[in-house]
From Swiss-Prot:
Its EC number is 2.7.7.6. Zn(2+) 1 binds at residues 69, 71, 84, 87. Gene3D superfamilies: 1.10.132.30, 1.10.150.390, 1.10.1790.20, 1.10.40.90, 2.40.40.20, 2.40.50.100, RNA polymerase II, clamp domain, RNA polymerase Rpb1, domain 3. It comes from Rickettsia akari (strain Hartford). Binds 1 Mg(2+) ion per subunit. This is DNA-directed RNA polymerase subunit beta'. The RNAP catalytic core consists of 2 alpha, 1 beta, 1 beta' and 1 omega subunit. When a sigma factor is associated with the core the holoenzyme is formed, which can initiate transcription. It comes from the Bacteria. Keywords: DNA-directed RNA polymerase, Magnesium, Metal-binding, Nucleotidyltransferase, Transcription, Transferase, Zinc. CDD domains: RNAP_beta'_C, RNAP_beta'_N. One of its GO terms (molecular function) is DNA-directed RNA polymerase activity. Its cofactor is Mg(2+); Zn(2+). One of its GO terms (cellular component) is DNA-directed RNA polymerase complex.
Amino acid sequence: MSVVNFYGQLSNTQQFDQIRINIASPDQVRSWSFGEVTKPETINYRTFKPEKDGLFCARIFGPVKDYECLCGKYKRMKNRGITCEKCGVEVTVSRVRRERMGHIELAAPVAHIWFLKSLPSRISTLLDMTMRDVEKILYFENYVVIDPGLSILQKGELLTEEELQKAKDKYGEDAFTASIGAEVIQQMLKELDFAKLKHELYEELQTTSSEVKKKKIVKRLKLVEDFLESENKPEWMIMDVLPVIPPEIRPLVMLDGGRFATSDLNELYRRVINRNNRLKKLIESKAPDIIVRNEKRMLQEAVDALFDNGRRGRAAKNANKRPFKSLSDMLKGKQGRFRQNLLGKRVDYSGRSVIVVGPELKLHQCGLPKKMALELFKPFIYSKLELYGIATTIKAAKRMVEAEKPEVWDVLEEVIREHPVLLNRAPTLHRLGIQAFEPLLIEGKAIQLHPLVCAAFNADFDGDQMAVHIPLSIEAQLEARVFMMSTNNILSPANGRPIIVPDKDIVLGLYYLTLAFDNEVGEGMMFSDLAEMEHALYNKFITIHTKIKYRRNQLNAEGKMVHVIIDTTYGRLMVGELLPSNPNIEFKFINKQLTKKDISLVIDLVYRHCGQKATVIFADQLMKLGFKYACSSGISFGMDDMVVPESKSTHINETQLEIKEFEQQYSNGLITYGEKYNKVVDAWSRCTDRVANDMMKEIATPRVSDEPNHQKINAIYMMAISGARGSFQQIKQLGGMRGLMTKSNGQIIQTPIISNFKEGLTEFECFNSANGMRKGQIDTALKTASSGYLTRKLVDVAQDCIITEKDCGTDKGIEVKSVIEGGEVIVPSSEKILGRTAAIDIFHPVTNALILNKGELINEAKLEQIESAGLDRIMIKSVLTCESTTGICSICYGRDLATGTLVSEGEAIGVIAAQSIGEPGTQLTMRTFHIGGAATKGAEVSSVEASYGAKVKIISRNVVINSEERKIVMSRNCELLLLDNNGNEKARHKIPYGARLLVDDGDMVVKTQKLAEWDPYTIPIITEKSGKVLFKDMVEGISIRDVTDEATGIPSKVIIESKQYSRGAELRPRIQLLDAEGAVITLSNGLEARYYLPVGAVLSVEDGVQISVGDIIARIPKESTTTKDITGGLPRVAELVEARRPKDHAVIAEVDGRVEFGKDYKSKRRIIIHPIDETMSIEYMVPKGKHVVVNEGDFVKKGDLLIDGNPVLQDILKVMGVEVLANYIVKEVQAVYRLQGVKIDDKHIEVIIRQMLQKVEITDSGGTTLLAGEKIDRHEFEEINKKAIKNGLKPAAAQLILQGITKASLQTRSFISAASFQETTRVLTEAAIAGKVDKLRGLKENVIVGRLVPAGTGYFMDKMRKAAVKLDEENI
């Protein structure tokens, strides 16, 4: 017996390792066929039998009934294989009608529409004609010259009917050959000599210098090479014979009323046959040329409609004006073959029902209604009934089950015991959307679900439904139990934190239980054991909130039991009793008011130190305790719990006075409308916060009362602070003031809603708030779809990313440092490196002791050592630098977040990454409307304070002292660092240009000391020398305009866009500084003192005035701020992973150098960078209206922004390299999710980035056969170069390119996967011409061909099978 057979014999359908797609030759089509279809009839409407030679002909396609010929002469099995001599039908199973094909011999050749119209058109590219011209020939509009003969016509020239006639008259009938229709295209394709053509194109490529021409030649050359490699013949793109697909695949079914429903394909085939037959008759009867040509054109159109209806011209429609579904439509889209039937199948042994809560279940159980279980496990019950002799036959068993005899229930209990079932809730956004449970039989009709798994399923009990599936085989049951059991899915694969965390009521109950009040009965009493305390509690000597002392036994660090006396409450001790005993889990973790966060931390600790079983038991008991006390606490939501602070009116009056002042300033022309708007919005934001803070203070203070059982703490406050329900954002609106609202376009309405929900809104306020609320509702509806689409694209691009080996052996890695924003450490580096592996040996900076070996996993213990050593920058391995050729290695990936151990081989990390990024997207889309459109914008930052006592260090310090003796920052990239005593960076602040610096380099500062301040609403333009102002190129009405404010009547000078005037194009408005002699002052960098003014700048000085150093000569108002929410976020994530150019993108400097402004060109400004090493200077053309963030003479570093905005990802890759790009994308994506409080591990985003960086673009072909401009796989490129070097040839050069996820998915190695994703016809056309081979490596293509996916257990089966084949070969 061979080793292969040992691993299960591959069934007949499975004996292939790869799939190849080709263009079918006419001979091949005939070889598939079982006969020619010559009649358009389908079935006889009287006898309902198929017509002979028609589209359902039994002679061609096989018998309609099993083992029965059409005329009924031969019936039954004994006659199988006989062909009836009367009706010509072979006696066999009717199933062959699903497999046998027919064909139609076409009377005239017809072009295949995919090769003609699928862009780029293959036929026209090969013939080097435009698609329009080829169409004119095919659809009988123009003739084409094949052989110019003695005439001066060109080969391939098009002639109309008149031109042809004229040429014939001029040169004679036989002087040249011109023809029309598909025949001539077929002939032209036949005449192509690919070897010769390839040589000619290569030569032309070398000689041509035009980029456009090169691109065109490369395209054609690629196509020629594809044909040569695949051995397809180009004339096969024109068809002489048409295949007819089996009739059962295009069925005709009889409806109740004697009418028939038919597949559209039959109608399309009928048209083709009718036109074909008519054409045959016309040719035979030698009809006039014009009639024959018209019929040929109609045949071409009929075949086009069959293959791809609507692709060219008007779609063929049925009687109801609905277009017919063609063969292409059968494959395309969500309802097509790929996505509907191959990737998404309906399965047997499943059911669905409403879910209800099952608080008494254990974590691994679910309640299954008896009726449902009986139906789902029917076959198992039948076999057991028969086995035990309760029923004699299956039929008897069936009757017993239908009658629901008592014995049946006993058998059902036995069948169900330890047989896991899968529960799934749609939408399944991540792998925790399907989990396995052990069923418990229950009465009723609803499925009971354990409360703790609701978070993973995102389920609630307001009518949600769930589906049940039964794993049938032993292997499936085993996988369900080992991998999918709810108890094995405690951690979230997105961030490695527990997902089985108490929520809502449980949290509220535990919070209430762990409260400690002053002056309770029995305060300060001492107890030695719980029984004694319980006694005291029941006799009302203490309450659960009384502060007491207790002697507790616990394990110390050595693992010995010790007695400690602790201050605690009875409630906290009850939680403490549930803790597993472990020296690392100390009582202090729960000896406090437990909020949701604390509980999550404790569960995490228990999991890390005591393992899975202990965690499950702990979580279950915690849940029961929480529910019990949520019930007995009697916490409810009351009107009086919403407290309106007394100080509210004071704050509002103050703010209104402030706003009057702003209005006054605006009327006096001191500030622009935009600045006023920003200030007003800010003032109201601050007011709302103050009211909210006062309200919070009032709510948070315990109430004192002599009433028994009086609730001391505000119920609403408890709900919010514990994390059970609601947020302070919502409480603010209930009792404070609703605050500012947003318009539908995201702009903030200046008049806030002063009322809250308790007081009720006025009509006007209600109208204003409806606007923002409506936006929330609409957002939710629209975003859910786009989020689902993003997930789908992510899954598609990453689906073949699988862990394939332990270690790829690379030395590369990426450096990780803390994320600092506004001087605050938002994400410490320790959080980013947990669960990753070190890329180098890591030593203690002081003692030089080895902390981590290279390639060692950073776990919690190692992390503590790194933190205590004060290391902030760590080199870690990353999937981005992994050098595995297929897949990724375990060491580069690090910890599997769902288990907390090193990731195992076969894990489908790509899909997990895609789900982790996509799943929160859907949740976030639904976040906007919970706040009901209230604006959530913080006041603008206008200063920085020291967050620590530290020493100041200023990077790129360039300051001037102005007339008020203030230090003004003149540098564009000034940063202020706070260093501790060891010189470690504690905080980093970016100080904007024009800020007033209040400290200097080397100063010591104390906490909360102000370091710098600036105007947050405008960007100033500041002088660095004193002198006299001279306006240049400021022409009234063309480049500058006096803008008089409508409300105030105050004029101010504003720079305007001068495009519309011819002379305006040359103007470059600027201010120059003159010395006493009237000469232009020279600055310190040797350039003249001239300041270019962008469009929109408001002048602060008049022409001819004297100004001093550090004065503001103009202000550029910042755009008014809009609220940030995931609405901006989700499209931002999509923009990043699709690698799109942002709308107003930044321009980044490619080299270090000095900036100079060159001569403008039309509506563009010219920025020139002169590199330090005086090589070629680099020019950038930027639109005039854009805000340039550098001044003339500034020194810029490589990668600095020249123009504000989001940088283009491709630019970052080109200028700064892969690591900087990856860091940027990770940072930006994380920023979007962080805004919503969602945690995703960096490695998931890195996996996606790796998939986006799979391809390289050839820049120089060297000695290889690659073409410049061709895009190929990175590993493929390396292989080709290795071969070239081996053969002594010059290797090719290439640059890495970044592709968006859609593009990357469509260019994957597997054409099956790409075709099932998008643009099905284009992908298949391309693959057929190149004769592509799909090696079936990814998950998707294996699902489509119906195999186990090569991940998880399937990966090992695959590996074993391959090893077995190898062994067999060796043995032979």
